[in-house]
Amino acid sequence: CFHQTKKGLVLSCVVAFLMISARKQMVIALAMLAVCILVRGIRSRNAGRSVALLAVCAAGVLGGSTLLDLGYNYVVRQDAVRHSSDGRFITTMAFYTAERSDAAYIEDEEIRELFLQIYDACDEQGYLKHSAGKGWLNRVEHFGDSYDCIQIDTMWPAVNAFVRERYGEDDVVLSEHADRIMGVINVSVLPHNLGKLTASFLDNFLSGLITTVAQRNPVLNWYSLVAYCVYLLLFLWNLWVGKNRRVLQIGGLVLLSIFFNVGLVSLVIFCQTRYTIYNMALFYIALILMLNEWWKARSF
């Protein structure tokens, strides 16, 4: 896509569409496509054309994904609606970082009572951030252990019961009202806990960098640090000394992809390996390619 052939651009859009349709986390594929198009535009001094091209590609990929969602739900549920409940990840973060006093920010009395019901159940079990131990590793492990307990075991059943009691059993109606309720909680509570959200994000981001290249344990944590240092040194060498621009491009795109993916995951969920492993093979392939360029230059 750096060379922006029509075939390469169309293929990149198709791949991005398929990846996003399979897993919404793969919106990073569209972000990487955007980087390639914009870099190409800057290099060719035709930024305006690249921005327009990016807009067309993004509209095509996201529009196609939306149509697929609508079509799937129409076939399965006989109702053309978007995929629902994506906001539950953000709401889980809202509960994890909240304090009981944050209920005062929710204006709707019924939703406020629901918030307190879920909050008290989570707090009693020690699922919330203020129950985490001291130190980075304890915080990360507590968040990972608590996340599904908050969302799957506590919040989701309570929200579903709340909606069914008031709006009936229809799945589409249930999903719409559940999304609305979680949206109210998110908008009301999250802005008052930005500091704790940022702290959790940074903890998760570091954890995600580790689980991208290894596993999280006292020995491999240090290995991960060494691996990233070696990668960055080789990348800088290829930037300043190396002659193979394709290897440099691969190294840079893989690094950007890791940052995008880990950043996105860290915002909404804990960085377990199944969310970060997508870039593991790419990391080591790029590392070997850059190491090979350095070795060939050293050999002559």
PLM features: residue spans?
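Membrane-interfacial entry segments at the cytosolic side of transmembrane helices
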Residues: 6-8, 43-60
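Membrane-interface alpha helices of multi-pass inner-membrane proteins
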Residues: 9-23, 58-64
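Transmembrane-embedded, aromatic-rich helix segments that form part
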Residues: 11, 25-40
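Membrane-proximal stem/loop segments at transmembrane-domain junctions that anchor or position
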Residues: 82-203
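Membrane-interface catalytic loops of GT-C/OST-like multi-pass glycosylation enzymes that act
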Residues: 22-29, 77, 265-280
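Transmembrane-helix signature of polytopic, lipid-linked glycan biosynthesis machinery
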Residues: 18-20, 67-71, 257-272
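Membrane-interface transmembrane helices that cradle and orient dolichyl/undecaprenyl
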Residues: 1-8, 298
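Membrane-interface anchor segments at the N-terminal boundary of transmembrane helices
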Residues: 169-259
